[in-house]
Amino acid sequence: MSGLLSRETFAKITNPLASALLRAGFTPDTVTIFGTAASVVAALTLFPTGHLFWGGMAVWLFAMFDMLDGAMARARGGGTRFGAVLDATCDRVADGAVFAGLVWWAAFGWGSTSLVVATLICMITSQVISYVKARAEASGLRADGGLIERPERLIIVLAGAIFSGGFGVQWPLHTAMWVLAVASLVTVAQRMHAVRTSPGALDLLPNSDAGQDTAETNQP
């Protein structure tokens, strides 16, 4: 992202607030859960009812808690492994709620098949992008980078919603979702390529490991 939208820029705002919340007795995990819950409520109440502008603004505001909990963790000397897993899990939940709210409005508000398809692609690939990296790292492989990551994804989708809602036109959200859909598919391909070209990626697994992976895959 550009310097204007970077974490360093927001740190100037979040660091003092993070220190104040810590002094008040709040924890990073508490802030993570609150921010996610608020984002989910905003996305699933405002987007499906056609309030795209206010939905986009509300989700953007609560998404800032994703930076605030990290600032709190750094201020107290570091985060925990559980906190990292909780943060990543909550990110996936919030992203799913945003796309679910938008796909509902696309289908039943605007009746746009094209927007429904684009939003569903974005919903699926947003989860796959994260899963590829997590699964690769669990296997000792590399899956960093890619064209689109979560901050860029939020900026694109929320900008589309805010402009469509603010000006009462459909094309900003349509454009944003299709741009994001294509970019997300490219990112999945980039990450899979990074995994495949990682050292040891094509080494044969021992029979016991291969059987375990197969069994896990076949579980319901």
UniProtKB/Swiss-Prot annotation:
Active site: 91 (proton acceptor)
GO molecular function: magnesium ion binding; phosphotransferase activity, for other substituted phosphate groups
UniProt superkingdom: Bacteria
Disulfide bonds listed in the record: none
Root EC class: transferase
Pathway field: Phospholipid metabolism; phosphatidylinositol phosphate biosynthesis
UniProt: a CDP-1,2-diacyl-sn-glycerol binding residues: 29-32, 70, 74, 80
Assigned EC number: 2.7.8.-
GO cellular component, one term: plasma membrane
Cofactor notes: Contains a di-nuclear catalytic Mg(2+) center.
Localization, UniProt: Cell membrane
Pfam families given in the database record: CDP-OH_P_transf (PF01066)
Residues that hold Mg(2+) 2 according to the record: 66, 87, 91
Catalysis: reaction(s): a CDP-1,2-diacyl-sn-glycerol + 1D-myo-inositol 3-phosphate = a 1,2-diacyl-sn-glycero-3-phospho-(1D-myo-inositol-3-phosphate) + CMP + H(+); 1,2-di-(9Z-octadecenoyl)-sn-glycero-3-cytidine-5'-diphosphate + 1D-myo-inositol 3-phosphate = 1,2-di-(9Z-octadecenoyl)-sn-glycero-3-phospho-(1D-myo-inositol-3-phosphate) + CMP + H(+)
Membrane topology, record value: Multi-pass membrane protein
Keywords: Cell membrane, Magnesium, Membrane, Metal-binding, Transferase, Transmembrane, Transmembrane helix
Primary localisation category: membrane
Cofactor(s) of this protein: Mg(2+)
InterPro entries in UniProt: CDP-OH_P_trans, CDP-OH_PTrfase_TM_dom, CDP_ALCOHOL_P_TRANSF_CS, PIP_synthase_PgsA1
GO BP annotations, alphabetical order: phospholipid biosynthetic process
Bilayer-spanning residue ranges: 21-46, 52-72, 93-110, 116-134, 154-171, 177-194
Binding residues annotated for Mg(2+) 1, in chain numbering: 66, 69, 87
Primary role: Catalyzes the conjugation of the 1'-hydroxyl group of D-myo-inositol-3-phosphate (also named L-myo-inositol-1-phosphate) with a lipid tail of cytidine diphosphate diacylglycerol (CDP-DAG), forming phosphatidylinositol phosphate (PIP) and CMP. PIP is a precursor of phosphatidylinositol (PI) which is an essential lipid for mycobacteria required for formation of their cell wall.
Family of the protein in this entry: Belongs to the CDP-alcohol phosphatidyltransferase class-I family.
Subunit organization: Homodimer.
Protein name (database record): Phosphatidylinositol phosphate synthase
